[in-house]
Amino acid sequence: MLHVISPAKTLDFETPPITRHFTQPQFLDHAQQLIDELRPLNPQQVSELMDISEKLGVLNAQRFLDWQLPFTTENAKQAVLAFKGDVYTGMQADRFSSQDLAWAQQRLRILSGLYGLLRPLDLIQPYRLEMGTHFANSRGKNLYEFWGNRLTEQLNRELAQAPQPLLVNLASNEYWGAVQARHLSGEVITPTFKDRKNGQYKIISFFAKKARGMMSAWIIQQRLDQAEGLKDFNSAGYRYNPAMSSAREWVFTREEPV
């Protein structure tokens, strides 16, 4: 059983990593191609492309220029420890044991606009390139066309080696769109997290993102390899809600945010 999550815009390259172990991204040559096509953009063009401030445009244009191979622990950091958004706040990977990290390396994948598909210990350098960015490139009009079926094929190769050919989708719609789900050679289950507000269960973005990270950590720390085990997830007050769930969308609800 594999599970996938989204990356984060917020990064932490200052805190020392909790492990010396690392691997290299599997799609590094494709990332290099994207970098080569992004480097000619000036800060204003980067700001307009990503709909970000002038200050962030300057920062990210410089990141494209600074990006260089080879990746080492001196100029890069393990992906699961470098990302620091809401999902990763929920995950708290900096508290993982060495055994947790080793297990996650085999079961967790992070979708990325620049790196394609990352394992937790794959080294990355600082970047910002969301999957939904409308960046016309040598392969098409956006990043979905750039990646094509490559990420799906890699996931299929890994699903073929898993004890159960099941993919748990904990990614956002933006990133899941880079996976051609109908061509996956395994079952897909998408957990959804809803909080009770004004008498109704609703998806509240901040809480849902954090919950996806908590479920990822729970899968890893429980060494979960069977779908049914997901229904026992109960972090932060969430519970599996069979009445609201379907065969492929498993809904977890809670009465009050914790």
Swiss-Prot record:
InterPro entries: YaaA (IPR005583). GO terms for cellular component: cytosol. It comes from the Bacteria. One of its GO terms (biological process) is response to hydroperoxide. Pfam families: H2O2_YaaD. HAMAP family: UPF0246. Belongs to the UPF0246 family. This is UPF0246 protein CJA_0191. It comes from Cellvibrio japonicus (strain Ueda107).
